[in-house]
C-alpha cells in the first residue's frame, strides 16, 4: 500500500546513471517523509556487455536505488513506444534527469504532468554536452557552476530554472570538481523542485525559467584520448589546465626519449606546477636546470611532480629524472 500523499506532494521518476546524479537523488529520497513525495521508478542506462576482464562498469545510480529498495528499469531507449507507455502508466508529476546519457523526446517529456528538469554541470548556455566539467577546466575558466533547466527536446537547451556558481580551485582536477559540483547541485535541484511544486499544470502557468541566450552557447563534446597529448609549445597554464582537466580520464600524456636506441616511451602526466619567465623557444621539450624534473614550454617551464611511465607505477618526476639520469639540455620530449 502506497503512503498517503499530501496535497502538494510530487511523484517522481528519476533518470540517471553516473555519480553526478546521486547526491540530488538522495536529497529527494530523504525528504519523502516530510513532503509526502514518492519515487515511482528509477531509470538507468542498460549495462554494456561484460568484457573478458573484470565485471561491468559501475553504475552509481543503480547501486544507490537498489540499496534503498527503489524499482529500477534500464530500457535500451527511453523513447521507444513500450517505454513511453510504461512511463505514462507511472502517472508521474515530474521527471528529474541527471547524468543519464539519453536525450528525451517530446513523448517522454510529456509523460509527466510537469515535464522534466535536468541538472547540468555548467553555467548554461556554456558547455552544452557530455563533458561540461572537463571543458571548463581545459578552457582555463576561473569559475563554473551548475544549472537546472526545464527540459526541451534540444540537448541542454531548456530555460534555466535555478543555478549556482563556484570558483574553480587552482589545484582542482575534473574528478574533484565534478564531485563538488554534484553537491552544489543539490541546492539548485531543491530550488527548482520548490518552484514546480506550486504549479498545477504547465498549460496554466506558462513558461518556466529564463531562456538561454543563443549567442552564448558553447559545446562540451566527450573527451578523446588524442586530446590528452601535451603540446609543450603551449603556455604553462594551458598545460596545467590540460593535466587537471584530463583526470581521471583519459589522463594527459607525452612521449619521452630516454634512450635514443629505443622507441619513445609514453608517460602519463598526473601533476605539474608552472614557472613562467621569458622563454627561449629552443628549450621547448628540453630538460631544464632544476632540482626537480622541469621541461621547457611556451612561456617558461613546467615542473612535473607526478607521472606514470607505460607499464610502471606512478612516481615522482624527480625519481624519473634520477632513474633515467636525465641532464639539463637533454631533448626529452619526442617530436
From Swiss-Prot:
Cell cycle recorded as keyword: no
SUPFAM superfamilies noted in UniProt: FMT C-terminal domain-like (SSF50486), Formyltransferase (SSF53328)
Positions of region (Disordered): 203-222
E.C. number: 2.1.2.9
Gene Ontology molecular function: methionyl-tRNA formyltransferase activity
Family to which the UniProt record says this protein belongs: Belongs to the Fmt family.
Entry-linked HAMAP family: Formyl_trans
UniProt protein name: Methionyl-tRNA formyltransferase
Amino acid at each position: 500500500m502506497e503512503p498517503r500523499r499530501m496535497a502538494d506532494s510530487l511523484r517522481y521518476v528519476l533518470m540517471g546513471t553516473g555519480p553526478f546524479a546521486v547526491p540530488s537523488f538522495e536529497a529527494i529520497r530523504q525528504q519523502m517523509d516530510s513532503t509526502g513525495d514518492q519515487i515511482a521508478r528509477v531509470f538507468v542506462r542498460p549495462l554494456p556487455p561484460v568484457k573478458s576482464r573484470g565485471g561491468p562498469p559501475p553504475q552509481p545510480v543503480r547501486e544507490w536505488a537498489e540499496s534503498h529498495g527503489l524499482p529500477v528499469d534500464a530500457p535500451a531507449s527511453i523513447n521507444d513506444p513500450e517505454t513511453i507507455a510504461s512511463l505514462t502508466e507511472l502517472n508521474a508529476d515530474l521527471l528529474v534527469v541527471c547524468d543519464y546519457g539519453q536525450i528525451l523526446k517530446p513523448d517522454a517529456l510529456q509523460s509527466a504532468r510537469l515535464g522534466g528538469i535536468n541538472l547540468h554541470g555548467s553555467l548554461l548556455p556554456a558547455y552544452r554536452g557530455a563533458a561540461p566539467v572537463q571543458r571548463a577546466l581545459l578552457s582555463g575558466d576561473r569559475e563554473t557552476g551548475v544549472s537546472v533547466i526545464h527540459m526541451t527536446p534540444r540537448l541542454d537547451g531548456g530555460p534555466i530554472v535555478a543555478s549556482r556558481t563556484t570558483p574553480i580551485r587552482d589545484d582542482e582536477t575534473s574528478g574533484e570538481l565534478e564531485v563538488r559540483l554534484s553537491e552544489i547541485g543539490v541546492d539548485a535541484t531543491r530550488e527548482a523542485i520548490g518552484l514546480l511544486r506550486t504549479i498545477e499544470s504547465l498549460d496554466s502557468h506558462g513558461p518556466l525559467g529564463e531562456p538561454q541566450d543563443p549567442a552564448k552557447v558553447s559545446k562540451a563534446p566527450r573527451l578523446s584520448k588524442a586530446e590528452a597529448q601535451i603540446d609543450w609549445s603551449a603556455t604553462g597554464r594551458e598545460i596545467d589546465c590540460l593535466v587537471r582537466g584530463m583526470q581521471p580520464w583519459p589522463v594527459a600524456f607525452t612521449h619521452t626519449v630516454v634512450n635514443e636506441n629505443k622507441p619513445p616511451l609514453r608517460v602519463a602526466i598526473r601533476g605539474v606546477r608552472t614557472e613562467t619567465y621569458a622563454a627561449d623557444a629552443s628549450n621547448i621539450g628540453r630538460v631544464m636546470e632544476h632540482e626537480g624534473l622541469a621541461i621547457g614550454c611556451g612561456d617558461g617551464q613546467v615542473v612535473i611532480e607526478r607521472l606514470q611511465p607505460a607499464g610502471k607505477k606512478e612516481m615522482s618526476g624527480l625519481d624519473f629524472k634520477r632513474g633515467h639520469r636525465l641532464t639539463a639540455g637533454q631533448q626529452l620530449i619526442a617530436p
